[in-house]
Amino acid sequence: MSDKPHELISVIMPAYNEGSCIYENIYETIRVLSDAGYRYEVIVVNDGSTDNTLEEMERAVNEMGCLKIVNCRVNGGKGHAVKTGFRKASGDLVVFLDADLDLHPGQIQNLINILKEKRVDVVTGSKRHPQSQLNYPLFRTFLSNIYAFIIWILFRLPLRDTQTGIKLFKYEVLKKVFPKILCKKYAFDLEILVNAHHLGYKIAEVPIVLHFRRPMNWGRISLVDMSALGVDTLAIFYRMHITHYYDKIAS
């Protein structure tokens, strides 16, 4: 448990067409945080879903409370959804958690423990940590490893994985970094971590347990998405190392 029981934990959960699992993930997140004795708020962001995601969020509010709903009428991407949710956050610590239950919210506790023990500012889950347990398609693992190598070449981050959907930040880190962020979709995580590292914040990785739940090996990542991720990644490099855009934007 946190050594500061008064600390508030904000969990931001962006969701796009997650009607089949969003209620269960909200329930599990609230249960985990309640059992651990934390003060918390859960902020769920409906990112323009076309299924029953919003209705399931509203059902959770009616039955559980401790929940804020943000409804984006148009699908703007994960990055846009998280930034929108952050505007509603008031926690001392902020968790990003994917809504699909591939990563059980019970792992939040480990991220908080590591942040306290190692006295860092950011903790990220890592699929490439040697202690991680993965039930993950081989082709997705292959792509993830290639992307991680490219990131290391371009940015020399002290991380093996930037894209896993569970992360913990001190509030002040995001307050400083978010004004600089331009990516709205999959490279959003990378852009945050690159800027946090550039500003001198300490980052640690933790092993995760991942159970890939989608029926298709590709999941939702299409060739178009991968191409967009590549373009955005190069754009981050360009802004960081060529134009020094991020240094010109006040935090």
Task: Name each region found by the language model.
Residues 46-55, 101:
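A conserved acidic beta->alpha catalytic loop
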Residues 25, 53, 82, 106-108, ...:
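Acidic donor-diphosphate engagement hotspot in glycosyltransferases and nucleotidyltransferases
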Residues 66, 70-88, 93, 105-186, ...:
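Acceptor/aglycone-binding surface of glycosyltransferases and processive sugar-polymer synthases
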Residues 1-9, 154-156, 180-251:
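Hydrophobic helical membrane-anchoring modules
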Residues 38-49, 70-72:
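Short beta-strand/loop segment that forms part of the nucleotide-sugar
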Residues 18-21, 49, 78, 104:
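Donor nucleotide-sugar binding loop of glycosyltransferases
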Residues 1-31, 38:
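N-proximal low-complexity "stem/linker" segments adjacent to membrane-targeting elements
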